[in-house]
């Protein structure tokens, strides 16, 4: 525990083109070696391509793709006695966004298309249609949580460590077995 006051999370400046903090965070996750302008041009180009394909606005299409990749539950390792259990826990909203964006960027980097903008556009397009590597990753995480729901009663161990975070206990669990 820190002896001094707990520092709050820094506010991120909204994206200059669309005014979205979520998109600014996405640009930061995509950025390599501090080259923000390069990351922004890749994201804007990918969103333009995505908007042309979907017929929606750039931000709307991005939000749909992100929503389809956001996980609701994940597993955390908890040591009880001599055994380690994979305990399903609900994912907090900020972490949902962070995981979804990270998975989309990772999946786009692994694709074999010509440019990064095209790879990102294709991955976002696949995510909007509920297919693709990032959506598969979310389904794998959900499948792991479902397979380990027998250990959900150990959840109090993981909640105890998150009790200092606001809203940890006020939210309803995403799945019934987390009650």
From Swiss-Prot:
GO terms for molecular function: mRNA binding; rRNA binding; structural constituent of ribosome; tRNA binding. Changing residue 36 to A/E: Defective in ribosome assembly. Gene3D superfamilies: Ribosomal protein S7 domain. Changing residue 116 to G: Significantly decreases affinity for its own mRNA. It comes from the Bacteria. GO terms for cellular component: cytoplasm; cytosol; cytosolic small ribosomal subunit; membrane; ribosome. Part of the 30S ribosomal subunit. Contacts proteins S9 and S11. Cross-links to IF3 and the P and E site tRNAs. The strain K12 sequence is shown. Has been predicted to contact the N-terminal domain of IF-3 based on footprint studies; exactly how IF-3 interacts with the 30S subunit is controversial. This is Small ribosomal subunit protein uS7. It comes from Escherichia coli (strain K12).
């Amino acid at each position: 525990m820190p002896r001094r006051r707990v520092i709050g999370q820094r506010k991120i400046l909204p994206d200059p083109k669309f005014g979205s903090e979520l998109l600014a965070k996405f640009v930061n996750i995509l950025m390599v070696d501090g080259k923000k302008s390069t990351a922004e041009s890749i994201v804007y180009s990918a969103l333009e391509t995505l908007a042309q394909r979907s017929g929606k606005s750039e931000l709307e299409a991005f939000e749909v793709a992100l929503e389809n990749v956001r996980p609701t539950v994940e597993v955390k390792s908890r040591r009880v006695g001599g055994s380690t259990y994979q305990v399903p826990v609900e994912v907090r909203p900020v972490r949902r966004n962070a995981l979804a964006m990270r998975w989309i960027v990772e999946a786009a980097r692994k694709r074999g298309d010509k440019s990064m903008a095209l790879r990102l556009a294709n991955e976002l397009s696949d995510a909007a249609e509920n297919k693709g590597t990032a959506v598969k990753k979310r389904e794998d995480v959900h499948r792991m949580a479902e397979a380990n729901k027998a250990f959900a009663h150990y959840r109090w161990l993981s909640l105890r460590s998150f009790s200092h975070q606001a809203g940890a206990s006020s939210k309803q669990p995403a799945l019934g077995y987390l009650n």
